[in-house]
Amino acid sequence: MSHYGRIKLLLEQHGLSPNKRFGQNFLVDPSVAPRIVALAGIKAGDRVLEIGPGVGSLTIPLLQKAGAVTAVEKDRKLLPLLRVEAAGVGALTLVEEDALLVDYTALAQQLGGPLKLAANLPYNISTPLMVHLLDHHAAFECMALMFQKEVAQRLAAEPGSKAYGALTVQCALWAEIRHGFDVPPAAFLPAPKVTSAVVHVQMMRQPRVAVEDERHFVRVVKAAFAQRRKTLRNTLKTICPDPNRWLEQAGIDGALRAEVLTLAQFAQLANTPMPTSAP
C-alpha cells in the first residue's frame, strides 16, 4: 500500500478527516519528512519540538532519529491516533494546546534547554505563529519549517523587493534564514492550491543589530509597513506626532518607503528618541 493510501486508511479507521478550521493539510509524500529531519539537523538525544503533528507523517521520522519528541497539537481528535502510531517507536509527549498560546520559553526550560523545531505549520496561522516563535527566540536552537512558498519568500527577502515586509525585518533581527526545498501540492492531503517551501531558521544568541527596546522596534516596523505605498513621513504619523523631525534626527530620508530600509536603519530609527509633541 502506498503511503498516501495508508494515511487515508488511517484516517478512516479513526473516523477522521482533515479539518479545514485547523488549517490541516496532512503530509502524504514519504520523501518529504526525512528531508525536513535532515534540514533541522536532528540527531539522537536532541530536544525536539513539533507543531501540528497531524497524523504523524513527520513525527515518526523525528522519533526514529531523536528518540523523543514533544508535539503541540490543538486537535484533540488526533491525539489517540498519534499515540498509536508512536507506540514502540519513541517517547512522544503530546501537548494539547493552541500553538499561538504556548509559552515556548517555559517549555524549553522544562525540557532542559533550547529546542530544535521541525514542523509542517498550519497555513492559516503560519505568519502570526512565526512572530510568536520569534518572541520566544531564546527557546530555540534552530527550526525547519514548512510554509506556503509566498510566506517563506517573505522571511528572507531583500530590501527593495516585493516580498520584503515587517515579517522579514522581525526575522532578520534574531535569525538567519535560508531556503531548503520546495514541496508540491500533491505531497499533501488535501492538496493545497499553492506550492509550499521548507526553510531552515538558525536562531542567534544575540540580535544582529542593537535594539534598545524590542517591543518598540516591532511597533515602529509594523507602523512603517502598514501602508506600503506611502512614504515614511506619512506612515509613521500613526505613532509619532512629528515624524519629519524624528526621521531627520535618525538620519533617514522621510521621502523613502519602508520597503527600502535595512534592518540597521529600522534599528537606528527605533533607537532614536521619538518627539512627544507636534511641530
UniProtKB/Swiss-Prot annotation:
Record protein name field: Ribosomal RNA small subunit methyltransferase A
Protein EC: 2.1.1.182
Record carries keyword Methyltransferase: yes
PROSITE patterns named among the record's database cross-references: RRNA_A_DIMETH, SAM_RNA_A_N6_MT
Function text: Specifically dimethylates two adjacent adenosines (A1518 and A1519) in the loop of a conserved hairpin near the 3'-end of 16S rRNA in the 30S particle. May play a critical role in biogenesis of 30S subunits.
SMART domains documented for this protein: rADc
Gene from which the chain derives: rsmA
Residue numbers binding S-adenosyl-L-methionine: N25, L27, G52, E73, D98, N120
